[in-house]
């Protein structure tokens, strides 16, 4: 009698874990979650479509600008910014599938479910890991104030780090790649992560811990440490570049605290409950579901804001973007005198040299 009990809600079709996948035992009371499901059906498609449009436009422009610049050498930060834009672009590509699945169910089969789920998970974790890489690059360039030639991170090493980040992200996405499938739920087909019954609770818990520690806690710690050290350095520095660099750091920290930290904490608490096999009351379970939904939506907004926070704030990127929009740009062949043609002189054609300074573009 009444409404049929519904599954535990998590963000999107691919993030979080289905109640059947991570079941730690029945709730102490029969729990009806029709109100949570109704909120999810309205909230998830709206956020997914908004982030998809903004993320595709912003990150697509970042990629186009970086590629159009045609530089033979790039700074480590530029390499990681390019990879961050790629990860966020791939993530944005999966969101229309999430919106459609939330509205009308999943009708693309289990193979597509696994592919889209894996792409979502890999790109989501890669984006967070590349944010940590950029934070470390900025610390080396600004806080330690080393010239480009003396920094431990070089473009070639940055490429190796990028390969490692993508491999780690694929590893973290293995559960989604292997165990996602479509199945009936509440009268509709759903793309969900469902572990086989043969897997023990320990294996499921280990998978969750690996994702939380490697995909969230580690980059979270790196970013927090680097930005704290950067803030201390910039507060003690003098000169006209200090205020601008400090504003950038403050903007990044505020965006991180508002958009990323709540979801990371909610996921940590949810994983702790999973490992402790705690039973929740119905009201507590609903609050947890709503927290994961809302904070998960906030962290997706991050991928559409990254181009503004990490690329558009850079002077070099804005110069490259201006040349791209004006249809200009350097010839791939260097000018014999090392100067720009007269018609492009005002576009600041030559790439700025990395120097010993507080500039955020280093």
From Swiss-Prot:
GO terms for biological process: chemotaxis; immune response; positive regulation of cytosolic calcium ion concentration. The keyword Membrane applies. The chain crosses the membrane at residues 49-69, 81-101, 116-136, 160-180, 209-229, 248-268, 292-312. Residues 1-48, 102-115, 181-208, 269-291 are extracellular. Gene3D superfamilies: Rhodopsin 7-helix transmembrane proteins (1.20.1070.10). GO terms for molecular function: C-C chemokine receptor activity; chemokine receptor activity. Disulfide bonds join 113-191. It holds the Pfam family 7tm_1. It is found in: Cell membrane. Keywords: Cell membrane, Disulfide bond, G-protein coupled receptor, Membrane, Receptor, Transducer, Transmembrane, Transmembrane helix. GO terms for cellular component: cell surface; endoplasmic reticulum; plasma membrane. Residues 70-80, 137-159, 230-247, 313-362 are cytoplasmic. Its main location: membrane. Expressed at high levels in small intestine, colon, lymph nodes, Peyer patches and at lower levels in thymus, lung and spleen. Receptor for chemokines SCYA27 and SCYA28. Subsequently transduces a signal by increasing the intracellular calcium ions level. Belongs to the G-protein coupled receptor 1 family. This is C-C chemokine receptor type 10. The gene is Ccr10.
């Amino acid at each position: 009698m009444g409404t049929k009990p519904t599954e535990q809600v998590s963000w999107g079709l691919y993030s979080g874990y289905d109640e059947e996948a991570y079941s730690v035992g029945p709730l102490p009371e029969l729990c009806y979650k029709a109100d949570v499901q109704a909120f999810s059906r309205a909230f998830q498609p709206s956020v997914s479509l908004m982030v998809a449009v903004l993320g595709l436009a912003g990150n697509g422009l970042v990629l186009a600008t970086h590629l159009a610049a045609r530089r033979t050498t790039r700074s480590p930060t530029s390499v990681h910014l390019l990879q961050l834009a790629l990860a966020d672009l791939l993530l944005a590509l999966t969101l229309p599938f999430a919106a459609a699945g939330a509205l009308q169910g999943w009708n693309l089969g289990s193979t597509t479910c696994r592919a889209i789920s894996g792409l979502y998970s890999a790109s989501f974790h890669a984006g967070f890991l590349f944010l940590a890489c950029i934070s470390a690059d900025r610390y080396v360039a600004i806080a330690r104030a080393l010239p480009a030639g003396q920094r431990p991170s070089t473009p070639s090493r940055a490429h190796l780090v990028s390969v490692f980040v993508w491999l780690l992200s694929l590893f973290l996405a293995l559960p989604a790649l292997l165990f996602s499938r479509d199945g009936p739920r509440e009268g509709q087909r759903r793309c969900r992560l469902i572990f086989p019954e043969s897997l023990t609770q320990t294996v499921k818990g280990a998978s969750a811990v690996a994702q939380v520690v490697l995909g969230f806690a580690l980059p979270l710690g790196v970013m927090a440490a680097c930005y704290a050290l950067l803030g201390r350095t910039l507060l003690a520095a003098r000169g006209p570049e200090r205020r601008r660099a400090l504003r950038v750091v403050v903007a990044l920290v505020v965006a991180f605290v508002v958009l990323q930290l709540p979801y990371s904490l909610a996921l940590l608490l949810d994983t702790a409950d999973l490992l402790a096999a705690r039973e929740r009351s119905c009201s507590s379970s609903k609050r947890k579901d709503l927290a994961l939904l809302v904070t998960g939506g906030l962290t997706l907004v991050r991928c559409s804001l990254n181009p503004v926070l990490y690329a558009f704030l850079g002077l070099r990127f804005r110069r490259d973007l201006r040349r791209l929009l004006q249809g200009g740009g350097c010839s791939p062949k260097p000018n014999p005198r090392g100067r720009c043609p007269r018609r492009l002189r005002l576009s600041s054609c030559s790439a700025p040299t990395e120097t010993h300074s507080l500039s955020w573009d280093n």
